[in-house]
């Protein structure tokens, strides 16, 4: 019996399960036409756990131009904008929320609209509110989206055991609510040159998760790998090493071992178990310049599946740098002098 129990225990891993988006209702202090609060909780623009940037800002929430101060209720913090998420309906009991993931505003050339300094408060009934601190700070800082396509979550809040029906995000006033630094003349000059109004605020997506122990056999299997080899090298003690990214068709929760072979050289890597789920592995080829096309054999071994695949790695682009000599002769003042 002990052996059987141990075997069953070994087949279970911690996993964060997303609360269905149709159970989340969003509202905001204001919304720009075509950029509703609902767009930040309904999965629009999401591909799995990644958000796809959009030139026009589709699938994201954007406020109207906001320069004054507002608050959701007399019991919540004051700020420049607020964004409220209701979990379930008004008659449902508070839900357990063990993790919150936030994707900041991800519109190309407008990522500074993303929220920056934010107060996070929660409530079971919408009347009594409690502040969710970040350690000793009474606020969180949501990093600016870097505009990758697709983009992983910019901030993950671990909230073990939190029970709430309402979660309110209030962006601080005084120029700290988004990523337009009003004290940086370069930032403000860029905004003016691009005809950007720094008083807009936005978010791409917010998701809520509960933590549970899941049987590995119920997890989506990992059955496919894809490889992207960069054209860049990193400086390492052994010499320049080329970067690569390995992506998985489903998140890896149970951990995995990776074995590589390329050009007669072998190496290994390990992916630790993760309740969030790992969807990519960033690695380095062995030191040395890769000037010819090479074969890369990869073997992934996990309780979620075993995959073997051979990739053809194109040679890294070769660069030729030419230095041209340049001379200058001063021919003096060229304007005609008046007598």
Identify the meaning behind each predicted range.
Residues 11-15, 52-133, 151-217:
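Aromatic, loop-rich ligand-recognition surfaces of beta-strand-rich domains
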Residues 27-30, 35, 123:
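Short linear Ser/Thr-Pro motifs
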Residues 137-146:
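Surface-exposed loop and turn segments in beta-propeller and other repeat-based domains
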Residues 10-26, 43, 48-52, 155-158, ...:
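Mature N-terminal, pre-catalytic/accessory segment of carbohydrate-active enzymes
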Residues 1-5:
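Bacterial N-terminal signal peptides
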Residues 107-111, 142, 332-334:
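A generic structural signal for short coil/turn motifs at secondary-structure boundaries
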Residues 32-65, 336-339:
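Short, polar loop/linker segments at the starts of domains and inter-domain junctions
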Residues 327-339:
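The substrate-binding groove and active-site-proximal loops of carbohydrate-active enzymes
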């Amino acid at each position: 019996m002990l052996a059987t129990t141990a075997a069953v225990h070994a087949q279970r891993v911690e996993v964060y399960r997303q609360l269905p988006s149709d159970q989340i209702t969003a509202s905001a202090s204001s919304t720009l036409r075509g950029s509703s609060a609902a767009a930040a909780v309904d999965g629009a623009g999401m591909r799995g756990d990644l958000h796809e940037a959009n030139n026009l800002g589709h699938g994201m929430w954007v406020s109207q131009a906001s320069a004054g101060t507002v608050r959701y209720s007399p019991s919540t913090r004051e700020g420049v904008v607020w964004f409220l998420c209701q979990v379930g309906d008004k008659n449902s009991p508070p839900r357990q929320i063990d993790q919150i993931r936030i994707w900041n505003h991800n519109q190309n050339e407008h990522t500074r609209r993303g929220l920056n300094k934010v107060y996070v408060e929660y409530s079971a009934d919408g009347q009594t509110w409690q502040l969710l601190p970040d350690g000793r700070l009474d606020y969180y800082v949501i990093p600016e989206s870097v505009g990758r396509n697709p983009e992983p979550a910019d901030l993950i809040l671990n909230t073990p055991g939190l029970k709430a029906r309402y979660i309110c995000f209030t962006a601080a006033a005084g120029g700290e609510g988004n990523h337009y630094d009003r004290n940086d003349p370069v930032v403000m000059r860029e905004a003016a040159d691009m005809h950007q109004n720094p008083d807009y605020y936005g978010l791409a997506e917010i998701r809520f998760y509960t933590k549970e122990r899941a049987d590995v056999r119920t997890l989506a299997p990992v059955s496919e790998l894809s490889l992207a080899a960069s054209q860049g090298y990193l400086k390492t003690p052994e010499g320049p090493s080329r970067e690569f990214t390995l992506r998985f068709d489903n998140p890896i929760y149970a951990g995995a071992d990776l074995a590589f072979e390329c050009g007669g050289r072998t190496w290994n890597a390990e992916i630790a178990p993760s309740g969030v789920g790992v969807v990519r592995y960033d690695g380095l080829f062995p030191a040395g310049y890769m000037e010819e096309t090479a074969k890369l054999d990869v073997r992934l071994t996990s309780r979620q599946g075993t995959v073997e695949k051979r990739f053809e790695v194109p040679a890294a682009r070769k660069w030729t740098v030419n230095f041209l000599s340049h001379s200058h002769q001063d021919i003096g003042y060229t304007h005609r002098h008046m007598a």
